[in-house]
Amino acid sequence: MSRPYILISNDDGVQARGINFLIETLRPIADLLVVAPDSPRSGFGCSITSAAPIHYKKLHEEPGLTVCSCTGTPVDCVKLALNLLIDRRPDLIIGGINHGDNSSVNTHYSGTMGVATEGALQGYPSVAFSLCDHREDADFTPLASYIVDLVFKSIALGMPPFTCLNINFPKANKFKGVRICRMAHSRWQHELARRKHPYGADYFWLVGDCEELEPEATDTDRWALAHGYVAITPTNLDVTDYELLNVLKQTF
């Protein structure tokens, strides 16, 4: 049986600890093509570069491993790889491992999820991995065995069209297990902190607090992470609200 071929990108940048831990973990079991931003692109979601050229640079190449940096967004990285750089069809596309939580509302802003979303849109099984720890020196060691297991299961499962998996790990030395769960409902509030520039107009930092809209719910990604479980959320890229669709058909 041939080794799996996996495309990897992220939004923290090609030098980030998370993506390099992922490379180290998967290198013994798979052939890897890594195309990641040349600097952090956190919060870029599914954005693309349309008004500037995109450049890439090959940083490392050996049998079974190619690593490239790209001046574009996480989605640009996936598009570049799929259009120009792959040497065979990837068995899986992975975003991550992200430094920080991408559960609940963060799903919509995440460049890590942007990688998985683009992979799914292009017809490939895709997953996003995130650890609830923003530190540059975050410890990813407890994730290793879970990552390998989840990668093999994701490849074996395939995935229905226009779906991907959002997988978040709590910050812990040991996990209680895995929970399959839905996305919690939340929103960011108090998002801008005003600062005074000594020579001119005010400026702002994006900060904020995450408001939980259903704190008592026990079937969500937020609950799973808060209680020490790995949260796996199947994500559907068809954003049609079919219940409302039927209501509107009767209304208009």
Model-derived features with residue positions:
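Short glycine-rich anion-binding loops that position phosphate/pyrophosphate groups of nucleotides
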Residues: 12, 40, 73-74, 98-101, ...
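Short, Asp-centered acidic motifs that coordinate Mg2+ and/or phosphate
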Residues: 92
